[in-house]
């Protein structure tokens, strides 16, 4: 059985995650460290088979109501730095998956020494350009899989693909 290690910089988000962990049927396999990713990766001896993340990805913009919100939304480090720190914690065959804005994802794919083995372009509505990119990187040069995910159809209803992907996680699906 796998063990899941979460790393969260924001104290309130870490506390909420800890509460959620306690309520989980897998609570004994969930562990949380309140720390930034760079420090965690520099200090840990763990080598992970899979790292899944949603790092902050907005450039500084509209002022947030509080510092916690700004920390969660706005980029503090470059995406390439973040990826490199996480890669230092990867096992030999490990993978890193995360979400980025579409253009930032294209830039990262071209900037890293890791191989992008999966790219899913996320399209909010049929007929629109992709807004986000789900990416998976590996040290191994594996065949790349490219696909897309459309969230809403032309009638503003969730697509079958989106429902199939998220129904286990959304309460009102």
Regions found by a protein language model. Give the residues of each.
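Conserved SAM/SAH cofactor-binding pocket of Class I
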Residues: 1-61
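Mobile active-site "lid"/loop adjacent to the S-adenosyl-L-methionine
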Residues: 55-81
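Feature marks short, surface-exposed loop/turn motifs that line or immediately flank catalytic pockets
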Residues: 59, 104, 141
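Conserved Class I SAM-dependent methyltransferase catalytic core
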Residues: 77-130, 134-136
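SAM/dcSAM-binding transferase cores
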Residues: 128-173
